[in-house]
């Protein structure tokens, strides 16, 4: 009986790991809009300071379905020079010059999946190496820390008063590191990232057999830009996701977006074995807005109203001229 109860709790902890690359890390349909969420090497890659907010509600209509809320900030430490202006009060003003190679970023998230909740942050450092006038090689390292919480109030237990369940530490804190690398040119880009590199251990109680190890996750991204004319551009891209479970958690997003005057875009994405995704977005001055709808290809579509993802971003400052060729969502 004791082993049966332990099995129930174990299944509750890993119940969502059969889909979406074990879904121990947040999943995003609009990965092109903010690559920094999955790859720290993108921090400050375009020379701007950017704030991005993302809300994702998965399988709307199903109680305790996955949901994710994320806020990120990234910037480039551009080298500066000073110019003097003749005014009634003499001041020094800064203007960007060509040089800065360091990018910094921060990322806060709250990810809920059934009775499991992860809340944490990431602090990233990126180093960008210019190659010629329109190529860039980047590396990024991020320190992460998050709270893993287990809410058994949302679970159906055989015996909620059993001391075996009450011995579990339902809130634990896990530090870890993420790594990323990317290469960008005017017409294409590729990137690779690893998350949860240290495979943090979930110390769920005093007994050794209660401990569980988090999975390492791997992300491979790539995309290209094909300019049709001065108004239209086609942007195909792909995201490959896996984990230490390898082929059991292998998943791919294949996406094509069409841009009009860099102010509007729409696209279609296919997530293998999971969903078709419709997406659209627009830019107004320095503000960006995007929406994605996931139509499930599995039987869960009969019980939900699809998955919805909304993103908003704003860019501050003036990018150094040499980075403007990168600046496209």
Residue ranges and their predicted role:
Residues 17-22:
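Sec/Tat signal peptide C-region and signal peptidase I cleavage site
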Residues 8-15:
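Bacterial N-terminal signal peptides
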